[in-house]
């Protein structure tokens, strides 16, 4: 019988090698553009004027980061809410502290202007 550590090792190795195989297959099977005209920037059928590399401000970045933070909070809150009656007062106090830390982080992000559109 395989030990639990061996099963976890096999799981990670399988995931790693499947990822490598998929990347190699993607490289081998993807179309290759050999001609220079296929590498040119296409902009509404016209040749580009000026530099084609334009950097955009990432205004949505902070919103996405805050969303991911509170999405992960939901992942941690759900099992606690399902087993609320069984866990008792200690788990309740732990969750209040956890939510308090997250509210403190939200307040700090709000204070620093991370949630304001600029």
Swiss-Prot record:
It is found in: Cell membrane. Its EC number is 7.1.1.-. One of its GO terms (molecular function) is NADH dehydrogenase (ubiquinone) activity. InterPro entries: NAD(P)H_OxRDtase_bac/plastid, NADH_UbQ/plastoQ_OxRdtase_su3, NDAH_ubi_oxred_su3_sf. It comes from the Bacteria. It catalyses: a quinone + NADH + 5 H(+)(in) = a quinol + NAD(+) + 4 H(+)(out). One of its GO terms (cellular component) is plasma membrane. The keyword Transcription does not apply. The chain crosses the membrane at residues 8-28, 61-81, 86-106. It is a multi-pass membrane protein. It holds the Pfam family Oxidored_q4. Keywords: Cell membrane, Membrane, NAD, Quinone, Translocase, Transmembrane, Transmembrane helix, Transport. Its main location: membrane. PANTHER family: NADH-UBIQUINONE OXIDOREDUCTASE CHAIN 3. NDH-1 is composed of 14 different subunits. Subunits NuoA, H, J, K, L, M, N constitute the membrane sector of the complex. Belongs to the complex I subunit 3 family. NDH-1 shuttles electrons from NADH, via FMN and iron-sulfur (Fe-S) centers, to quinones in the respiratory chain. The immediate electron acceptor for the enzyme in this species is believed to be a menaquinone. Couples the redox reaction to proton translocation (for every two electrons transferred, four hydrogen ions are translocated across the cytoplasmic membrane), and thus conserves the redox energy in a proton gradient. This is NADH-quinone oxidoreductase subunit A. It comes from Carboxydothermus hydrogenoformans (strain ATCC BAA-161 / DSM 6008 / Z-2901). The gene is nuoA.
């Amino acid at each position: 019988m395989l030990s639990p550590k061996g099963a976890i090792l096999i799981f990670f190795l399988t995931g790693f090698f499947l990822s490598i195989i998929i990347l190699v297959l993607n490289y081998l099977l993807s179309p290759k553009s050999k001609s220079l005209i296929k590498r040119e920037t296409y902009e509404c059928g016209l040749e580009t004027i000026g530099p084609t590399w334009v950097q955009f401000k990432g205004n949505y970045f902070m919103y996405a980061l805050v969303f991911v933070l509170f999405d992960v909070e939901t992942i941690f809150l759900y099992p606690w809410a399902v087993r609320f009656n069984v866990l008792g007062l200690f788990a309740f106090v732990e969750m209040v502290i956890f939510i308090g830390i997250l509210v403190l982080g939200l307040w700090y992000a709000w204070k620093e202007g991370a949630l304001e559109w600029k």
